[in-house]
Amino acid sequence: MPSCTSFPIGTRKSKLAVIQSEIIREELEKHYPHLEFPIISRDTIGDEILSKALFEFKRQLAKSLWTRELEALLVTNQCRILVHSLKDLPSEMPDGMVIACIPKRSCPLDAIVFKAGSHYKTVADLPPGSVVGTSSIRRRALLARNFPHLRFVDIRGNVGTRLAKLDAPDSQFDCLVLAAAGLFRLGLKDRIAQMLTAPFVYYAVGQGALAVEVRADDKEMIEMLKPLQHQETLYACLAERALMKRLQGGCAIPIGVQTDVLAISNSSYRISLLGTVLSADGLRAAFGNAEAVVSSEEEAEELGITVALALLKNGAGPILEEHQRSSDSEESLKNY
């Protein structure tokens, strides 16, 4: 028997975050119809500080931009679970916290959204000097690499805020780059003009997937979440996150991936993982890939590490060091 009848879910206050929490709540209610799963929302540092691009935050702070205030709810027992976009979670979880489950992944791709009424169909159609709105260093680097004639300007805020900025009569933006999964969940699929695919754009580690975080010692909740686990998604995302962890990457470093999964039995999957690391301007890039049959979490992580080592062998090291020097230099100037 459950220890109680109410298991609060913690999430950010944005419309998308609440919708994502409702997705998890609906799944839990299917399995536990006699229990309640109220949603508690909070703003995080990442929601409150909108004047900086994501890659401009100090590395240590960037790791908890979207999570620190929510994790306090777990520690104080105000919530039993937290629902996140997996791509917002650091590759190494804080002490005492674990990802209890990763449900089935939505579309991991990035999408182009043009200004309302625009006649353009693809990003390649944009004339020189056109302004692309994004605060992601990965998206900026990949698009600059393939479309050097474009300009990139930071844009922050929730999806609705960014779309309003795009569509404003005096907007400087010609288009935005957004995660397709978020647009789908918000019912905004009709705003998508183009899906960005490899070899032009590789998506973020964990993009399109949700993650449910709990306290590591909450064995009851971990057990209750097992029916929501999607094995194929879990293995793919574990491989991607192991790659990022080995490279010590985060939102301040342009790391992109593409993962293809083929089920070969009820418990085994053939996973192909390609990773890339780019300089901030996109002019230099390293690529690495590997394929393996995966039937355990350990094997999934081994695949990610293999691709990370291939990236380092193929020139990712100097690029990563350059990002680190740039980050250290900026921090030194701020502290001067």
Swiss-Prot record:
Family affiliation: Belongs to the HMBS family.
GO biological process, one term: protoporphyrinogen IX biosynthetic process
Principal EC category: transferase
Organism: Schizosaccharomyces pombe (strain 972 / ATCC 24843) (Fission yeast)
Modification Phosphoserine, positions: S327, S329
Lineage: Eukaryota, Fungi, Dikarya, Ascomycota, Taphrinomycotina
SUPFAM superfamilies registered for this protein in UniProt: Periplasmic binding protein-like II, Porphobilinogen deaminase (hydroxymethylbilane synthase), C-terminal domain
Protein name per its UniProtKB record: Porphobilinogen deaminase
Catalyzed reactions: 4 porphobilinogen + H2O = hydroxymethylbilane + 4 NH4(+)
Function, as annotated: Tetrapolymerization of the monopyrrole PBG into the hydroxymethylbilane pre-uroporphyrinogen in several discrete steps.
Metal-binding in keyword set: no
Signal sequence annotation: none
Pfam (any one): Porphobil_deam
One of the record's GO molecular function terms: hydroxymethylbilane synthase activity
